[in-house]
Amino acid sequence: METITYVFIFACIIALFFFAIFFREPPRITKK
């Protein structure tokens, strides 16, 4: 059961990284 927890944590970290990159790379979407 520990493997599932580790995978979940890893997935969360990757998702956070992807979100950060997506929000940081294209600043044209949030152009005010």
Curated annotation (Swiss-Prot):
The keyword Membrane applies. One of its GO terms (biological process) is photosynthesis. Signal peptide: none annotated. PSII binds multiple chlorophylls, carotenoids and specific lipids. The modification Blocked amino end (Met) is found at M1. HAMAP family: PSII_PsbT (MF_00808). It comes from the Bacteria. The lineage of its organism: Bacteria, Bacillati, Cyanobacteriota, Cyanophyceae, Thermostichales. PSII is composed of 1 copy each of membrane proteins PsbA, PsbB, PsbC, PsbD, PsbE, PsbF, PsbH, PsbI, PsbJ, PsbK, PsbL, PsbM, PsbT, PsbX, PsbY, PsbZ, Psb30/Ycf12, peripheral proteins PsbO, CyanoQ (PsbQ), PsbU, PsbV and a large number of cofactors. It forms dimeric complexes. GO terms for cellular component: photosystem II reaction center; plasma membrane-derived thylakoid membrane. It is a single-pass membrane protein. Belongs to the PsbT family. Residues 1-7 are lumenal. It is found in: Cellular thylakoid membrane. This is Photosystem II reaction center protein T. Keywords: Membrane, Photosynthesis, Photosystem II, Thylakoid, Transmembrane, Transmembrane helix. It holds the Pfam family PsbT. Residues 24-32 are cytoplasmic. Its main location: membrane. The chain crosses the membrane at residues 8-23. Seems to play a role in the dimerization of photosystem II (PSII). PSII is a light-driven water plastoquinone oxidoreductase, using light energy to abstract electrons from H(2)O, generating a proton gradient subsequently used for ATP formation.
